[in-house]
Amino acid sequence: DIATDARPEQVHKLFRNCRLIGRRFRLAHVQFGQEIVEVATFRGQSGDGEDGDGPGVERTASGRILSDNVYGNIEEDAWRRDFTVNALYYDIDNFVVLDYVGGIADLKAGLIRLIGDPAQRYQEDPVRMLRAIRFAAKLGFRFDPATEAPLHRLGNLLEQIPAARLFDEVLKLFLTGGAIQAFELLRHYRLFGWLFPATERCLNHQQQHYPKTLLVRA
């Protein structure tokens, strides 16, 4: 919700109703009445996972980021975001939208584009594949070819994600709009089976499309 150059600990000191969460990315949750405002510190460049990672970065052998609390400035933070359309900042002082990665152009074109090397970005956080599906389904956007290409072959990376986090992402996929489109895209890119293996086996042995029709119309 909010991005700032203040560190999480500094935000925590400013607000009484604040708690710090997250191991991968340290965040501050500030409660205002019934609302929770998420405050994130600008991220800096963490390296490429080979010999460029510095203190505060922890990865698995496959490249998935376990912990990354390297802080930086707003432009560095933009390049650390996942998709260009998700890297737009509204400056509350000057009332302007800041765009460092071409997000406005992609938003107007209805394009989902990853920032950086797509395969590496999916490996850093496989949940980005599900986020890509959710944005495309909910917004009716299409994929940039480079962003789309790895989706067919990296579904196995979802096995590395904790069940609780996958459950949360699945709820977002099917309960925030575009559920049928999300279902179709998950199957098209061979991701559905990694989330629902038993259902996938059923769908692969359907007779006259009955199981698929039941799911879509339910």
Where are the regions a protein language model picked out?
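Catalytic cores of the polymerase beta-like nucleotidyltransferase superfamily
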Residues: 1-218
